[in-house]
Amino acid sequence: MDTERHATLLLDLVWPEVDEKAQGFIYAKDFPLVVSRMEEILNRGKLERDRAQLVSETGREILRKFGSDQEFFKVYKEDFRELFDGLVGTSFKSAVKSCAGDGVLDRLQDSQAVDGIQDEKTSSHALQEEVMRLREQVRVLSSKNDEKDREITARDEIIADLQGKDASPAGSPRSLQRMRTLQARVTSLEDELSFRDEVIREKDRELLNLTKRVGEFKDKYQFLEREFQFYKGHREQKSPDSIKEATRHEFIISELRRKITEQSEIIGQMRMQVEAKPGALHPQGIGSTAGLPLNLPLRLVLRLIIGAILAYLAFDIGIRSLKAVGGLFGSSSPATLTPKSELSWWEQNTLLSKLLWFFKDLFDTYNLDAGRDEVVSANYDKLFGV
């Protein structure tokens, strides 16, 4: 059984236990309960040390907070996987794959099939006896009903004779018109109910999108908080402007290193996934000549992407490091025509000035205010999405 069927089987087993009324949805307060039931199924027959967790402790805390904050948010069965991915940060399929590697779901499905066959065999004899008993009761009741039917028929004839001229028979035009009116009313109410359900579903999806946006703003807030803590730890009273600027560039370099580390981990995981299963790129029955056009472009594209990212980050870190070093050890030669206080720090250093003006003339992408604090702050905010 592949991973997709594992995930579908696990969701189909747990969902009816929580959605007891078969409404097709559960409330967000029951979302952690679904995950805990899934973990109980996956850990049946396992020792305490071998028990697997579908989500981490951090993910479990996120689910509890989501269930308490959005208590009556409707979670539909078809939206469960997308919501699980958005909250935990891991796809539901991958989470099930990491916990069901020992074939526990295969054994569970086989045992359910065997139990169903045995229950069917043991209950067939009892059902036959129950059917025979019910048939005998039906015969007795039928004989009694015949007598009741004759009495009811006689009473109906008497009532029909006593009814006035204004009475409407069952098949009269007035009765038919009333029936059609009621049917139209029922149809209208059903359409209105379907429309309201669709509106509620759409609002639920909008709320899900807003939840994702809140997560993005939370990431930006955490970045600003790290920046504040960094500056708070490196503050120095009455320090020169060059040292303050160097501290700012030092934080930029530390953030770039952190991003390089994260991207290196992602690239390493992608490389492991590509190299772990060579059979996916070279299917059996196909020669090496036929597999070459599919294998070579994929590796080439991955290498080009990795090289471009590393080259860009190395160039950016180098430029910012040169700026920081120039701010600390810039030339202090006396000013000639322009006062030193009016020159930028990179204009005061001969080597950096030549290098930066050379790249400006070559690419024509720098402006005259590239080294000023306002432009640096704007570029810095744009880089980190603040």
UniProtKB/Swiss-Prot annotation:
Protein purpose: Component of the spindle pole body (SPB) required for insertion of the nascent SPB into the nuclear envelope and for the proper execution of spindle pole body (SPB) duplication.
TM annotation in the entry: 296-315
Matches recorded under InterPro entries: Mps2 (IPR031433)
Protein family (similarity comment): Belongs to the MPS2 family.
Stretches assigned to coiled coil: 117-232
Membrane topology value: Single-pass membrane protein
Source domain of life: Eukaryota
Any single Gene Ontology cellular-component annotation: spindle pole body
Localization annotation: Nucleus membrane; Cytoplasm, Cytoskeleton, Microtubule organizing center, Spindle pole body
Organism: Lachancea thermotolerans (strain ATCC 56472 / CBS 6340 / NRRL Y-8284) (Yeast)
Signal peptide (UniProt feature, chain positions): none
GO BP of this protein: protein localization to spindle pole body; spindle pole body duplication
Protein name: Monopolar spindle protein 2
Keywords: Coiled coil, Cytoplasm, Cytoskeleton, Membrane, Nucleus, Transmembrane, Transmembrane helix
Main location per the UniProt record: nucleus
